[in-house]
């Protein structure tokens, strides 16, 4: 090897001493943000909420351990607490802004609408991604409608009802739900002795005056089908299973755990921090989240009924109620494997197929095909 080759090798090499290594801290921090990409499914370890913290360790020697042991981290913390001025060991905790996950609540809501008592992790995560996209799209559309008003650009109940103007049954269902929630809130405030928030009542009265669509109480087929399905499911459960099923039916994004779940739901939507959203609007978004999950479960069960994998024994679909065979034409998805067999959880391909059919039916007109290039094209949402 000649002299020029050795010189190039010496220039490309870097020699770091132990003293320089001890004097210069090595920051173990988050990686630089990369370009946005398509959302990827997480692993099964992301179901449990974890508090992720990063450690910043100043090394004393030239040897750099790739995975420091907990004893070394604790030792570093004790040295910093001792207040030694010449110490080169420090321990700094940096909280990680991990994305908020609602896997537990979504799994309970899916179970309450007819899924298995142990939903698949991949299915729940896929529903979570669809839910976030749907809710952010609905809020964006409602904001565009609200921006036409100069005095109050914040979305209100009238804006969401304007988006649902072609579905009066859904408008009546949402109004009935919000009315029941106001009655329940007043009852709980009287029972617990807590003072009521009169500002919310004033905002609600202003919204009631803005509602220009007169919707009468109509026959809600979807709601009756869900109630019938829940009734048939409850008839074949044991005592402990019924208690768990009842708790799952109580799950929501605004009642359970109070302000904690409300703040978690707002962080899940990833809305701007400086955006002021009134409480009635957040209640409507929470209701639409509940309806979106219900629609996904409904379409997934109907997709399973229309697919070829519906291979079950006819007598195993008969429940303990004597009228089940006679009611199969009313709600056939109640008997999708229940009875002698174990209920099969909703799979990811069934959800994809259900969403494909929904988008195909919602993006077509009678007589001609409509694509995204049309002027009157609007994004399809499950809840509205």
UniProtKB/Swiss-Prot annotation:
CDD domains: HFD_TAF13 (cd07978). Disruption phenotype: RNAi-mediated knockdown in female germ line cells results in arrested oogenesis at stage 6-7. One of its GO terms (cellular component) is histone acetyltransferase complex. One of its GO terms (biological process) is transcription by RNA polymerase II. Its main location: nucleus. GO terms for molecular function: protein heterodimerization activity; transcription coactivator activity. It is found in: Nucleus; Chromosome. Keywords: Chromosome, Nucleus, Transcription, Transcription regulation. Belongs to the SPT3 family. Component of the Spt-Ada-Gcn5 acetyltransferase (SAGA) complex consisting of wda/Taf5L, Saf6, Taf9, Taf10b, Taf12, Ada1, Spt3, Spt7, Spt20, Sf3b3, Sf3b5, Nipped-A/Tra1, a histone acetyltransferase (HAT) module made up of Gcn5, Ada2b (Isoform B), Ada3 and Sgf29, and a deubiquitinase (DUB) module made up of not/nonstop, Sgf11 and e(y)2 tethered to SAGA by Atxn7. Taf5 and Taf10, which has partially redundant properties with Taf10b, may also be part of this complex. Component of the transcription regulatory complex SAGA, a multiprotein complex that activates transcription by remodeling chromatin and mediating histone acetylation and deubiquitination. The SAGA complex predominantly acetylates histone H3. Required for oogenesis; involved in transcriptional activation. This is SAGA complex subunit Spt3.
């Amino acid at each position: 090897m000649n002299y020029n080759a050795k010189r190039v090798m010496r220039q490309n090499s870097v020699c770091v001493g132990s003293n320089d290594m001890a004097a210069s801290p090595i920051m173990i921090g988050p990686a630089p943000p990369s370009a946005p990409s398509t959302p990827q499914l997480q692993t099964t370890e992301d179901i449990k909420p974890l508090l992720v913290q990063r450690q910043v360790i100043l090394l004393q020697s030239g040897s750099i351990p790739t995975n420091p042991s907990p004893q070394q981290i604790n030792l570093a913390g004790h040295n910093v607490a001792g207040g030694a001025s010449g110490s080169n060991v420090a321990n700094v905790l940096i909280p990680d802004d991990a994305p908020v996950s609602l896997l537990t609540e979504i799994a309970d809501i899916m179970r309450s609408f007819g899924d298995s008592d142990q939903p698949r992790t991949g299915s729940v995560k896929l529903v979570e991604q669809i839910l976030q996209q749907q809710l952010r799209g609905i809020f964006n559309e409602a904001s565009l409608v609200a921006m036409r008003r100069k005095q109050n650009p914040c979305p209100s109940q009238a804006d969401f009802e304007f988006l649902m103007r072609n579905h009066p049954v859904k408008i009546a269902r949402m109004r009935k739900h919000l009315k029941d929630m106001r009655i329940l809130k007043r009852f709980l405030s009287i029972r617990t002795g807590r003072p009521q928030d009169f500002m919310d009542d004033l905002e609600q009265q202003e919204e009631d005056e803005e509602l220009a669509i007169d919707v009468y109480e109509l026959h809600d087929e979807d709601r009756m089908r869900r109630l019938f399905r829940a009734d048939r499911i409850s008839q074949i459960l044991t005592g402990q299973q019924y208690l768990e099923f009842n708790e799952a039916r109580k799950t929501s994004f605004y009642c359970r755990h109070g302000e904690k779940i409300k703040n978690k739901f707002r962080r899940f939507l990833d809305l701007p921090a400086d955006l002021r959203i009134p409480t009635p609007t957040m209640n409507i978004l929470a209701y639409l989240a509940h309806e979106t999950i219900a629609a996904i479960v409904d379409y997934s069960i109907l997709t399973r009924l229309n697919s070829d994998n519906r291979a079950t024994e006819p007598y195993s679909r008969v429940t303990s109620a004597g009228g089940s065979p006679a009611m199969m034409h009313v709600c056939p998805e109640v008997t999708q494997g229940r009875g002698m067999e174990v209920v099969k959880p909703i799979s990811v391909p069934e959800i994809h197929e259900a969403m494909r059919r929904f988008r195909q039916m919602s993006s077509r007109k009678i007589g001609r095909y409509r694509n995204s290039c049309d002027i009157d094209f609007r994004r399809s949402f499950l809840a509205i």
